Amino acid sequence: MAVEALSSAPRVKVAPWNDPVIRGWVFQIVVVGAVGFLAWYLVSNTVENLARQKIASGFHYLEREAGFEIGDTMVAYSPASTYARAIYVGLLNTLKVSVLGVFLATILGTMIGVGRLSPNWLLAKICAWYVEAFRNVPLLLWLFLFYKLISEAFPGPRQAIGAFWNSVYLSNRGLYFPVPLADPIHKWMGIALLLGIAGAWALQRWARQRQDATGQPFPAISAGFGLALGLPLLVWLSGGAPHHLSWPELKGFNFEGGTVIQPEFTALLAGLVLYTSAFIAEIVRSGILALHKGQSEAAMALGLSRGQAMRLVLLPQALRVIVPPMTSQYLNIVKNSSLAIAIGYPDLVASINVTINQTGQAIENILLIMAAYLSVSLSISAFMNWYNKRIALRER
């Protein structure tokens, strides 16, 4: 009876401004409207000011001739190429130094991090001094130092240091060495290399499953390297083993022919790797220390050596702690590569900086830089998040 009385009681009407649902919708509409108005005002005001100053807008300039040289290119480029091509070349240079930096910094940082935990007092102290020295000095200063050392320590092209029967030359202009001339077989060698890498990955998975099932190890690393390198070698031999090379030769004041690793690239890569590896070393060390001490004791009790315990027991478990903060370091390598402009390496920022100076269209070019770095960073984050989920513990 009391329930019927409660259900039949008239509902109290609430004013619209006191209804939290209606109030929430109103606030959201007001905020979205204010943001939209602000965006419209900024865009319209910018377009009007650009028109008043007779500065073109839009991305049509990308189809015009660039008219400037780029010293280090991975693809064909000349001053007659378009601005779009020049920006593409700069992006490839950024990706090249970033990928190599991530790979080398991971290896070096892992070695330094493990070295800090070594029972060898001298090795542990050297690794600790390395970490403290590199991570407490700004990266830009390291880049200046490495570039100055490379440009001042080595002789000029006429006094270049020759090696390997004068086929390789080292000077303050870079490291010159011979490269194979273009041949159709190289395309098939590249395909064979990709197939070999895929086969090595499948072999590694099979070896791991076999060891889990039988306890018998399989030399998957050496076999994988043999497969990845053996397939391209077989393709090269089956294609007649073409060995025509372009050799570096001193002509005038510099070398021509072959290829060169420029000092700007070397200084940038060395700075990124040594600086970032100091942070990665601390991440690796903290990840290993986060494990229970009983893990290492159990590994030793099974008869494993210290190296085997680290490789087979400790590091695989520490990955769950190491991977999340490593994402930030990989992103830092990509973003810090923009400091290349300080030592003259033609990366994405340098190419777009020249484009801005010649076209005057700063807004569009800055948007291109932001879009490029955002795309690369999101791709790295997505991959690392996927890998982190893959190695996470799964509860039953």
Language-model regions: role of each:
Residues 2-396:
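Transmembrane alpha-helices and adjacent helix-loop boundaries
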